[in-house]
Amino acid sequence: MAARPITLGIDLGTTSVKAALLRAAPDDPSGFAVLASCARAARAEAAVESAVAGPQGREQDVSRILQALHECLAALPRPQLRSVVGIGVSGQMHGVVFWKTGQGCEWTEGGITPVFEPRAVSHLVTWQDGRCSSEFLASLPQPKSHLSVATGFGCATIFWLLKYRPEFLKSYDAAGTIHDYVVAMLCGLPRPLMSDQNAASWGYFNTQSQSWNVETLRSSGFPVHLLPDIAEPGSVAGRTSHMWFEIPKGTQVGVALGDLQASVYSCMAQRTDAVLNISTSVQLAASMPSGFQPAQTPDPTAPVAYFPYFNRTYLGVAASLNGGNVLATFVHMLVQWMADLGLEVEESTVYSRMIQAAVQQRDTHLTITPTVLGERHLPDQLASVTRISSSDLSLGHVTRALCRGIVQNLHSMLPIQQLQEWGVERVMGSGSALSRNDVLKQEVQRAFPLPMSFGQDVDAAVGAALVMLRRHLNQKES
């Protein structure tokens, strides 16, 4: 019997790098098994290369990101790496890194395995970068796209550099996200390739025509030669130009994917699944019906955004800034109050006790709007507590109301009725805050009364590997 194919998935995240090996598993409901995975902290934060960017600048050192990637791969089992038939790569969207074509990296043969080290490469300016003020953004041309442009988006950053550091841009002739860079270096691509998932995250990209707003950009003096060529997500960018951690030279490498899309792909078994992730923040994503096209003008006040997915479809995504971080704020407040009263209690003890109390308290009239951080579409909204009565003041009541408020806030952004109109039949629940909180699970089931599945955590590295695994299996069948 032929060995089942193995694919490698890599995710280059903001704080960590992850790699996962997947094998086809026809007997498993998911169709795949994770053979091994490894994560390493990137620790890549770097001093900003331009003083003009000020304290809002956020940059990362590419060599540290690659070091974390190499550490991940070195920890994976070598015999399985030798059997890899495809590599999928995803990563943090919106950011931009610049390099010189043909000089972006150098392959070194000295160690146990050939590795590539960055050469004529800038820092990565990340999605968290805040150098583009609202005044600066208002001065930019209006994009011909359904997505608006924000600080930290690749095209906005390039506009900023054009204005404040034009000499910097003259040093480079290629640009992409960090994961586009890795794919280009692995394959020795003469020009970077970019999926529409990452292009849309840069701004000034029209997903309907699958093209950059070249005329709009050119008329504003934008260096359009830096814009990567566009390729379909799920397609092959090229083949590895060297053996790499036992992975054979000539192995297929997929076009880099957005981490949001790869994460959702890892969990969404059917097109009729919605994926709910409650970690620090909250995301609820569903695949839009085929043929759906978003309105062609940006609406920053809309609570749902539409992002390119696969096969020219879109994901509808409600992303709330208020999730597990709100519970953490509440726990911290209680611990602080007790410290003020002369009592010392561990945060972990408070968390487990308050969840226990809320499990016992099945209902409450207390209403908490938990938006302590506002929302992207309502930045000025703060949190509030209403319908307070003397009978609803126990820890159980307050914790139940807080968990309900987190879920109800999400439901107000993307209601169950909307999901059902899109054809959603099941919700896949994931994320650290949801997995360890039975009260949140109960409230999710109350607000979204659909079949629920908990436990399969979203994982962008697994999603990237899965895209390449399914591609390989489809190629074999055809």
Swiss-Prot record:
Principal location class: cytoplasm
Q: Does the keyword Kinase apply?
A: yes
Q: How does activity depend on pH?
A: Optimum pH is 8.5.
Q: Which is a Pfam family this sequence falls into?
A: FGGY_N
Induction / repression? Down-regulated by LPS.
Q: In which tissues is it expressed?
A: Strongly expressed in liver, kidney and pancreas. Expressed at lower levels in placenta and heart. Very weakly expressed in lung and brain.
Q: According to the UniProt entry, what is the EC number of this protein? A: 2.7.1.14
Biological process (GO), any one: carbohydrate metabolic process
The set of disulfide-linked cysteines is none
State the protein's name.
Sedoheptulokinase
